[in-house]
Design a protein with these regions (language model features):
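Conserved catalytic or regulatory cores that recognize and/or transform ribose-phosphate-containing ligands
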Residues: 1-153
Length: 153
């Protein structure tokens, strides 16, 4: 599957090991992951972009999200840009897994309930299982249950 991964560029130095752990896990499961815009960019390089380059960068991000089957966002560090990307993915009807490793879940995301938005606290030990469960869910491999009513005559 095609995965769009995002996280805070400004907190990349602190969270790069987590970003890499998530991306490496997805790649090991043979998923195609778009992530280089996060791991190869710096806050300074983004800030130095002129308007034309920022718009082109934003257009690329939109196309990557459109092409993805789902999104994974590492949100341990608050980021307006990541929130925007999540909102865009949801608007495009993409399933989104929001991961955070410390503290409380992102408050604005937990306020709303969407069947395509899943928020999970993770550790290095359980992140793979969380990702697998999410992928099984969006592939439709989760349990389907029905309630049948029988009328007596």
């Amino acid at each position: 599957m095609k995965v769009y991964f995002t996280g805070s560029i400004s907190a990349k130095e602190a969270y790069l090991p987590q970003y890499n752990r998530i991306v490496d896990y997805l790649k090991a499961k043979n998923h195609t992951v778009t992530y280089e815009h996060i791991t190869n960019s710096t806050e300074e390089s983004v800030r130095k972009m002129d308007k034309a380059h920022r718009l082109a960068f934003h257009h690329k991000i939109e196309n990557w999200i459109k092409a993805a089957d789902f999104m994974i966002a590492e949100t341990s560090f608050p980021s307006v840009s990541v929130g925007y990307e999540i909102a865009l993915a949801l608007r495009l009807a993409k399933p989104v897994l929001v991961l955070y490793s410390e503290g409380d879940p992102p408050s604005l995301l937990t306020y709303h309930s969407y069947d395509r938005l899943h928020t999970e606290k993770y550790t290095s030990d359980n992140v793979g299982g969380i990702i697998d469960d999410f992928i099984h869910y969006i592939e439709g491999k989760h349990d389907t249950r029905f309630t049948f009513f029988f009328l007596r005559k």
